[in-house]
Amino acid sequence: MTGRAMDPLPSPAVAAAAEAEADEEADPPATGPRTSQVTEWRALDPGRMQMPQGNPLLLSYTLQELLAKDTVQVELIPEKKGLFLKHVEYEVSSQRFKSSVYRRYNDFVVFHEVLLHKFPYRMVPALPPKRVLGADREFIEGRRRALKRFINLVARHPPFSEDVLLKLFLSFSGSDVQHKLKEAAQCVGDEFMNCKLAARAKDFLPADIQTQFAMSRELIRNVYNSFYKLRDRAERIASRAIDNAADLLIFGKELSALGSDTTPLPSWAALHLSTWGSLKQALKGLSVEFALLADRAAQQGKKEENDVVEKLNLFLDLLQSYKDLCERHEKGVLHKHQRALHKYGLMKRQMMSAAHGREPESVEQLESRIVEQENVIQTMELRNYFSLYCLHQETQLVHVYLPLTSHILGAFVNSQIQGHKEMSKVWNDLKPKLSCLFAGPHSVLTPPRSPQEDGVCPH
């Protein structure tokens, strides 16, 4: 995955290559004086990627530790009318920073862009799609949920959680958070530039890193496919519970309408007038229980949407961000490294041709270009190894999240148990009220009996 093997670089040359790129990227074109607030944000940033003691490649987090980093709520606030169209704002509240700020979708877009710029070798979750014309409430609610999943995954990601960009996004209450985010991102290069171990990433990688990467990628692809199907089934189960609630409510309303009917009976039915009156009274009273049944079914559906489907979506978002990262590795730094090697080979052949043709000036120019290209290749090789280093850590992070499966299954089982228990209680409370519906000879109640009561044993 790294292209043609390069000769090992002496450590001073490696450090020099990294420092040269750091100097180049860390000093962008002047954009005017920086505000004192941005300086303050940078001072708060511990983000020179301080590594723990021991092997820095290995993560030591548990799922509970990641979940405890922060919980961020994203709630809709009433729509405001712009010049032409309405726009949606969100109230974003962080437990960790004890902050509550207003953000628009475009603020999330800029935050996503600067994260990708600073952390190109990490799992940056995707954003939900931009609003389309005629977007309905269902679309807006779905996007709110997706934004909440995005910001919680970011807030719990180890490098992101300690970065100034996250603190800015979650707690800056000024008028233009987008400008502040871009300004903060311009002040520093990407993670490769700021990580003290970037130039030595290769030293920490296992010898079979390429094999491990291929195996992990295949495993996570299979896990994603299975969880995608589980999410679809869970959505259908929750949707059926909500549909069941609507049907039960209509069922009860129709019983109530039947019991409230005041149409006079024909003369020949006068003998049964008292019976029909009792039946109507009973039917009318049943609507209360059916409304309660509908409420219980709706609660179960909503609970499974929040506790099961949303957690499945969160895990799928994480897995998708890992798949996206693998693609960035292959199409980004790896592809650039291979192109640099190819260009280097062409230059060598051109120099050999010029030497045979006895063209001293051409040879000298080509030698200078070859030296420059060697520096490019050295830097690209360092970036490639650092990308693999980050990929290895991100793979570990996915595995830290795997126990979320048990949380999801537990929530599903508990929801089913609680839902059926509550529904059963209402059905049992309803049954005695059916007594007047079963009037037999001499007004003796004769409700239908079960097969066991009839002495029939089902086969």
From Swiss-Prot:
Name its species.
Mus musculus
Name the gene behind this protein.
Answer: Snx8
Keyword Membrane tagged: yes
Question: Where does the signal sequence lie?
Answer: none
One Pfam family, please name it: PX
Molecular function as annotated in GO: phosphatidylinositol binding
Q: Which GO terms describe its cellular component?
A: cytosol; early endosome membrane
Please provide the record's keywords in A-Z order. Answer: Endosome, Lipid-binding, Membrane, Phosphoprotein, Protein transport, Transport
Q: What is this protein called?
A: Sorting nexin-8
Q: By its UniProt entry, which CDD domains does this protein fall under?
A: BAR_SNX8 (cd07597), PX_SNX8_Mvp1p_like (cd06866)
